[in-house]
Amino acid sequence: MAGHSKWKNIQRRKNAQDAKRGKIFMKLAKEIYVAAKEGGPDPESNASLRLVIDKAKNANMPNDNIDRAIKKASGSQDGKSYEEITYEGYGPSGVAVMVKCLTDNKNRTATSVRTAFSKNGGSLGETGCVSYMFDRKGYIAIEREDLEIDEEEFMLEVIDAGAEELETSEELFEIYTEPEQFEEVKKSLEERGYKLATSEITMVPQTYAEVDEALQEKVEKLIDVLEDDDDVQEVYTNVH
């Protein structure tokens, strides 16, 4: 699955400049608000809320911000109503792009996403045009620094926990699961004492497009423009 690009994207999110970090926290607060409003404020009984709280903590979002978003959802009878929409399209040279949004105005969001594609060498496509190239997976990364365990031993532990696939590098163990097994695997690894660098449900390309440096820069520019939109929660591509 060549997950290292997934890790790179997560690190990019974590290391965002202060101005961008504020926008990331705002988007995460929106996700927390929606999850708490739809499934209740208790993460113990609300799996969606548990997942987004983990995602927020991975992004170093302060606990006060997380609690505030949950309380806002709990005390709101009306409030804004957000709809989740995923747009699909093609970036420069036809690379596959999926854009997950939470919006209270579909027309505004569609126009904004379409403009981002068209001004950055891409085009917005029809529903289903690229989603078949991705699989929804659980993703867990564990940094190997100071971890005294060999790959074979760790692989046996991961398989025992219910994981689907393990990828290794000098710095990382990257674990993939079916979405239904994600929480079970995550809990098992935590109970064994592993510190998870990140854990989330994501979209993973079945194969990655090989691109040169110039095309990589164009794709990253498109991603930056899309991520700058307040309605855009996640951008997935099949580029390393």
UniProtKB/Swiss-Prot annotation:
Tell me the keywords, alphabetical order. Cytoplasm, DNA-binding, Transcription, Transcription regulation
| A molecular function (GO) term | DNA binding
Q: Which domain of life is it from?
A: Bacteria
Where are the residues of the annotated region Disordered?
Answer: 1-21
**Which regions are flagged for Basic residues bias?**
1-14
Report the coiled-coil segments.
none
Please give the InterPro entries that the UniProt record associates with this protein. Integrase-like_N, TACO1_YebC-like_2nd/3rd_dom, TACO1_YebC_N, Transcrip_reg_TACO1-like, Transcrip_reg_TACO1-like_dom3, YebC-like
A Pfam family hit? Transcrip_reg
Task: Please tell me whether the keyword Kinase is annotated for this protein.
Answer: no
Q: What is this protein called?
A: Probable transcriptional regulatory protein BLi02909/BL01150
According to its UniProt entry, this protein's organism is: Bacillus licheniformis (strain ATCC 14580 / DSM 13 / JCM 2505 / CCUG 7422 / NBRC 12200 / NCIMB 9375 / NCTC 10341 / NRRL NRS-1264 / Gibson 46)
